[in-house]
Amino acid sequence: MKEFTYRGHKCCYSEFRSEGTSKTMILIPDDGRAGYSVQDFMSYIPSEYKLVLVDFLGCGEADTPYGYVSDLWQDQAMQLKELFFAAGYEQAILVGFGEGGCRTAEAFLAEMPERVERVIFTAKSFVPRSLPEELLPKVMTIPDSMQYPGENNWRTLGLACRQLLQGDETRCPYCGGIMMRGLITGSRDLARWTIDDGIHIAGVPDEGEFYLRNHQPKGFLENLKDLFNKETERKTAYVCYACGKLTADIKNLI
């Protein structure tokens, strides 16, 4: 791990994919967590991003000053400021995890907005509290409808984050939720929905089947077969994270 100093104490960070990448993404863990606690998220992020994990004071390999409380969000934002100077980052995307990581990212955005390209809040039902209106266009929040139960559901968070980064926010015509684009393959009697090549996650086979197997909405397979005609072919289709509805008619999407 690399080191930088904040008020005379050692903080640490690790860089991944540092060669040949054009953008920097800093992953900010929840209160009291080391940077490695969010490393499972990294495999879902496009390869053009350099990924940075941070150990704030009191966490991981960083120093723990006497009496230091590790959930001081404003203080952690100041540690991020020192990281930017030490590592030479001109601008980065911040991804906050949990309430603490999101509050730290929010505080840094308010302090140094010129250094932030985007902030992605992953905590469920998270609402920014201290951002002026002019900074809100930099904020991206993963909707509750895109988050499945489970504290460490990196797969769904990664998919949602990737979709937001690509600007693909197709809306469900039934409930307004965000839909995931995929392909129907097979035949009417044996239809299968999988993520299409545009948002395929390397190293995660049959992600669409994972979705169906673990989060199959009522009547989903029947809707899938109705959408598919009798001939064997490939069709683009969208699945709503919120209500589970499936559609192939882009013109009707809102």
Q: Across the structure, where does each feature detected by a protein language model lie?
A:
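Conserved HGGG/HGGXW glycine-rich cap/lid loop of the alpha/beta-hydrolase fold
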Residues: H9-D63
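Short cysteine-rich clusters marking metal-coordination/redox-active sites
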Residues: C172-C175, C240-C243
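Active-site loop/oxyanion-hole signature of alpha/beta-hydrolase fold enzymes
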Residues: F56-V95
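Residues immediately within or flanking Cys/His clusters that coordinate Zn2+
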Residues: E169, A237
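Conserved hydrolase catalytic core segment
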Residues: E90-S130
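Helix-rich cap/lid subdomain of alpha/beta-hydrolase
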Residues: T122-L164
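Alpha/beta-hydrolase fold catalytic core
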Residues: M1-M25, E48-Y49, Y89, R155-L165
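Short, non-ligating residues that shape and space the ligands of small metal-coordination modules
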Residues: R181-G182, D249-I250
